[in-house]
Design a protein with these regions (language model features):
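Long, terminal "pre-/pro-" and other extracytoplasmic accessory regions
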Residues: 1-119
Length: 119
């Protein structure tokens, strides 16, 4: 069901304001188990029902590594310093990150590279 941005959980609203301050919400939808948000720039964010983000993807511009915990960001920069982030998905104890070099890399919350594959 389509909702007003003010209908998003406070944690989701705060995350968008902090991480994408100049990118207004174009569309917000509430589903049974999550929320889907589209920003004006084309960035799409999926939130858990509690407002914590679970997936961010950007078809037109790279995502900032600052969206990741420091340990994960540092491991990614060390492995692929020139690659741009297109999608980030939170897993239970790791992150799945899609890069512009057609790689998907899996990094644990503490920065250990768990694996990668060519997409």
């Amino acid at each position: 069901m389509v909702i007003q941005p003010s209908g998003l959980p406070k944690a989701a609203q705060d995350f968008i304001k902090k991480s994408f301050p100049n990118d207004p919400i174009l569309y917000a939808e509430q589903n049974r188990k999550d929320f889907d948000v589209a920003l004006q720039s084309g960035i799409e964010i999926e939130f858990f029902i509690n407002g914590e983000w679970k997936e961010i993807k950007s078809p037109y511009q790279p995502l900032s590594a600052t969206l990741l915990p420091n340990a994960v960001s540092n491991a990614l920069k060390q492995k692929y310093p020139q690659a741009s982030i297109l999608k980030i998905e939170k897993q239970y104890s790791s992150y799945e990150i899609s890069l512009d070099n057609r790689r998907e890399i899996y990094i644990s919350n503490n920065g250990e590279v768990l694996g990668e594959k060519l997409d």
